């Protein structure tokens, strides 16, 4: 089980590292990262379920991992570089923590999968309909960009 958890994180981090965000302007790179994360989570619902299960278990198995921090350091480093480029060019506001940016991206992209059934039932909507997903994806990207954008 621990090996499966580690591989799930390794897979997403490997794909993230191949996004070539350094070649894009900071805001475009952030949009690409958030869009990728949204799409990844939607396309890999078992990954979300795995993370949810580990959280239900209070991280008991992940706590045994000798690799999990190293697997996730590149994600934070990438966000840090992207964010610092944006601050240096004046498009992102200073004073934000890259870990918090990552947490915000994760929260907004994770919810759409983790809560699809309850949210859909409560609000009588098909949260996975293509038009609903497209609108939600655009909104999530916009929320994150507005969060980091300089005034």
Task: Locate each region found by the language model.
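Alpha-helical structural segments
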Residues: 1-22, 28, 32-39, 50, ...
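Short, structured helix-loop boundary elements
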Residues: 2, 27, 31, 65, ...
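A short, mixed-charge helix-start or loop-turn motif at secondary-structure junctions
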Residues: 19-20, 61-65, 125-130
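Short coil/turn helix-boundary motifs
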Residues: 22-26, 44, 58, 151
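C-terminal peripheral helix-coil segments that are non-catalytic and often amphipathic
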Residues: 36-39, 43, 73-92, 104-151
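Amphipathic alpha-helical segments used for helix-helix packing
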Residues: 42-66, 115-123
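Alpha-helical transmembrane segments and their helix-start/interface "positive-inside/aromatic belt" motifs
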Residues: 93-96, 100
């Amino acid at each position: 089980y621990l090996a499966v958890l580690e591989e799930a994180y390794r897979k997403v981090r490997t794909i993230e590292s191949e996004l070539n965000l350094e070649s894009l302007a900071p805001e475009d790179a952030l949009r690409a990262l958030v869009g990728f994360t949204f799409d990844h989570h939607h396309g890999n619902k078992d990954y979300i379920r795995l993370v949810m299960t580990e959280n239900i278990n209070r991280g008991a198995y992940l706590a045994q991992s000798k690799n999990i921090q190293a697997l996730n350091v590149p994600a934070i480093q990438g966000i840090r570089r992207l964010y610092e480029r944006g601050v240096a060019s004046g498009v992102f506001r200073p004073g934000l923590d890259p870990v918090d940016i990552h947490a915000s991206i994760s929260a907004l992209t994770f919810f759409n999968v983790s809560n699809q059934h309850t949210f859909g039932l409560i609000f009588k909507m098909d949260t996975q309909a293509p038009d609903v997903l497209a609108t939600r994806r655009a909104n999530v990207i916009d929320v994150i960009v507005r969060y980091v954008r300089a005034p």
